Amino acid sequence: MAATCCWGRSGLSSLTRALLEAEKRQCRALVRTGKKPQGIRYLSSCGILASRCPKLPRPASPAHIQGRTFLNLAAPLLGSKRIEYSESKVLGFSIEQMYDIVADVQNYKIFVPWCNRSKVLSCKKGVTRAELEVGFPPVVERYVSEISVIPLHQVRAVCCDGKLFNHLETVWRFSPGLSGRPDTCTLDFCVSFEFKSLLHSHLASVFFDEVVKQMVCAFEKQAGRIYGRQEVPLAAAAKLRAMR
């Protein structure tokens, strides 16, 4: 039994040496010819042949999906146009009374058409920043407006941050009303706006004309609720407007 085992070890050793010699001869031949066997790689660290491992495909990097809402997408493709509206009216309230109503941005949510929310954010160096929310189904948007004033003469509001408008500017001007009637004033209202998307423009065209046309009336009604209604002679008011 012992002799058999020794012969077995000797035979295995001889077989191993023969395989290694064959491998070396093959490698020397490959070096001379400059060819590489297909599907075979040489592991120099241990001197054995091994099948080439196929490269695993790299996992694809996560695709970056750019999210854009339909309204934002419509803007650069379709665009919109700037719209302007102005109105002048003689009112039965003094300059100071109407100025106080227009400058009271905090309470716009109470009486301004389609204004759902109004909140003053800051007031520095004569400039007030306010956040307004306007809603006309199905659109409800918030924007920040900067309001600057010339006391008893002008209130100017400009949209400075929002998704709804490319441009929104509102100007109110106050001047004397009927001659000899300090309890009257002339209110000039001007608004210009441009929506960021054509879709908003289409929605606005259905009703926004009525909104801006109701604006002066809304402020006049608010003044009536606070100060009491004051009538202005229509003929005198018409004559004053004609002179302007």
UniProtKB/Swiss-Prot annotation:
GO terms for biological process: cellular respiration. Pfam families: Polyketide_cyc. It is found in: Mitochondrion inner membrane. GO terms for cellular component: mitochondrial inner membrane; mitochondrion. Its main location: mitochondrion. One of its GO terms (molecular function) is ubiquinone binding. CDD domains: COQ10p_like. It is a peripheral membrane protein. InterPro entries: COQ10-like, COQ10_START, START-like_dom_sf. The keyword Mitochondrion applies. Keywords: Membrane, Mitochondrion, Mitochondrion inner membrane, Transit peptide. Interacts with coenzyme Q. Required for the function of coenzyme Q in the respiratory chain. May serve as a chaperone or may be involved in the transport of Q6 from its site of synthesis to the catalytic sites of the respiratory complexes. Belongs to the COQ10 family. PANTHER family: COENZYME Q-BINDING PROTEIN COQ10 HOMOLOG, MITOCHONDRIAL, SPERM PROTEIN HOMOLOG. This is Coenzyme Q-binding protein COQ10 homolog B, mitochondrial. It comes from Xenopus laevis (African clawed frog).
